[in-house]
Amino acid sequence: MRFDIEGFITFDTEEASLVNLLTGDCIELSATSTRLLTNLLQYRGDIISRVDIFQSVFEKYGARPSNSNLNQYISTLRRSLADLGIEKNVIITVPRIGFKISEEVIITSDNDYSSSFTLPVLTADLPQRSLLW
């Protein structure tokens, strides 16, 4: 799956990378960072609790979650996005609850492209002939 962030950063979940489309700069992400960012982007606008993140990003893959680990991964993602030129705070901390993607950030995904793009209907318009008799 691919997400575009602010129109110039692409996050490719298969490649586990963030790419600035304007400069070509690329940052490789760890598997855990990729799962975390994917989770946040898929539920953008919603607050994802720490407990849900622990389960879906860490425990499900055999890793032991902790608040310290999670905070470190969030910090790394924020730094990576800033290094690629995003000036907005993309990942918002909701104190004592969890995290969410800022509603001010423009995010599009593969699903958004496929559902919003439709091919135009083509009609066979034959040239009109006027007969002058």
Give, region by region, the residue ranges found by the protein language model.
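Short boundary/linker motifs that mark transitions into or out of structured domains
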Residues: 1-30
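A broad, structural micro-motif
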Residues: 9-11, 48, 65
